[in-house]
Design a protein with these regions (language model features):
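Hydrophobic h-region of N-terminal signal peptides that target proteins for export
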Residues: 12-21
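N-terminal cap/lid segment of alpha/beta-hydrolase-fold proteins
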Residues: 23-66, 111
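Short beta-strand element of the alpha/beta-hydrolase
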Residues: 64-74
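Short amphipathic alpha-helix adjacent to the substrate-entry channel of hydrolases
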Residues: 81-100
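Gly/Ser-rich "nucleophile elbow"/oxyanion-hole loop immediately N-terminal to the catalytic nucleophile
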Residues: 123-145
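Glycine-rich nucleophile elbow surrounding the catalytic serine of serine-hydrolase chemistry
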Residues: 143-153
């Protein structure tokens, strides 16, 4: 194949990739403020580094969808949230799942903190199932490394 045909094919591939719809992505506080259970979208004053939150990836297509809470690893000292969180959620959303990436609390010796976060994330998904297009009876958890341990507790 000559160079011109290769360039044309590459250009078409890029155009087609750009035409694929991106999954809808939204971020919410994990823990409600002042007794509210409805999720609150993250605002400008939110402490992203220290407070737990979830990132929801909605799939295109049929509703209600099954959901999966994604717990990234990081040895309970940090989070590999890019490749073990957001990329995994995009993969699930492209296959018809709602995916919720959990940015959980670092335990600093108190492992009840992240355990409560994953339990809260599951409850948050179930409580908002109708608005998020999720089947509340089909909510699972997946995790990597420390996130896998967290998801199993």
């Amino acid at each position: 194949m000559d160079m011109t045909k290769k360039l044309i094919l590459a250009a078409w591939a890029l155009l087609l990739a750009a035409a694929v719809p991106a999954q809808q992505k939204e971020e919410f506080r994990l823990w409600p403020e002042a007794g509210k259970y409805a999720p609150e979208r993250l605002g400008a004053g939110f402490d992203r580094d220290n407070a737990p939150y979830v990132t929801l990836y909605r799939p295109e297509g049929k509703k209600p969808a099954p959901a999966v809470v994604v717990c990234p690893g990081g040895a309970y000292g940090g989070l590999a949230i890019g490749h073990e969180g957001y990329q995994v959620a995009e993969w699930f959303a492209a296959r018809g799942f709602a995916a919720v990436v959990l940015k959980y609390t670092m335990p600093h010796g108190n492992y009840d903190l992240p355990r409560r976060d994953v339990q809260q994330a599951i409850e948050l998904v179930r409580a908002n199932a109708a608005g998020w297009g999720v089947d509340p009876a089909r909510v699972g958890v997946i995790g990597f490394s420390a996130g896998g341990h967290l998801g199993s507790t």
